[in-house]
Amino acid sequence: MGNVRIAFCHRQLLYCLRRIVFLILFFILAGCETLSFYGQLASGQLDILRKREPVERLLKDSSLDIGLRQQLAKIKDIQAFASLELGLNPEGSFTTYVNLNRDYVLWNVYTAEAYAVHPVTGCYPFAGCVPYRGYFSKKRALDYARRMSEERGLETYVGGVSAYSTLGWFKDPILSTFIEWGDQELASLIIHELLHQRIWLKGDAQFNEGLASFVGNTAAILWSQKHGRGQDNQRFLESQKQWRSFRQFVVLARQYLQI
């Protein structure tokens, strides 16, 4: 078993290193701060990838925590549903597991001009323009937010992120930061991220997130009904209704204030 694990890690590490080296070389001519930013992204991504454990091997381990076993098996069912019913092939994603031993995988920094409600966007290769800047370290995120506030007078917000998609660049693992979510939330998230791998329009974060959320939430209801897990659907639907109501309130407030 040890030799199998070593071989798996060796193959995956070489694959990941080739891609990460490409990304680093892509930004080698960038400024120091930009290079530092992408450097922490590459380092954080590599740390996650090297910690991956194959789900199939974990499920064969008799000492595996029963709760984790149930959640991993559930995600396999969700993947099968996404592939057969929605045509969203995982392409190797969510077939490995990583225990991060922290609450969030990333921390996003959102910034806006003082008294404005439109976020400052940053444009990046591959992802396009998005209204946030991600860090694998909470301290780095807070430091960047502080600098933006002190040096540019921007309003800032730092929020933890439980999951993200590498948009097909890497085979995204299941993370401990979301493994304990409820049935519908978990199904919505997995399908949401799989859709990002299939459809991502550079520079249109609102469309990308809106589409993935709609498909993920709708498919989660269908999956739970098909697998006899629909007893909590009403709770899930109610939480989505409350979120839509809040968003509508914000839109109306912006119109009223003419901002």
Give the predicted meaning of each segment:
Residues 31-53:
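Bacterial Sec signal peptide processing site at the extreme N-terminus
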Residues 78-243:
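Acidic/His-rich structured neighborhood in mature extracellular/periplasmic domains
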Residues 49-64, 122-130, 198:
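Acidic/histidine-rich, surface-exposed loop or edge segments in extracytoplasmic proteins
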Residues 54-84:
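Post-signal-peptide N-terminal segment of Sec-exported extracytoplasmic proteins
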Residues 6-21:
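Bacterial N-terminal signal peptides that target proteins for export
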Residues 236-259:
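C-terminal amphipathic alpha-helical segment
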Residues 20-30:
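Bacterial N-terminal signal peptides
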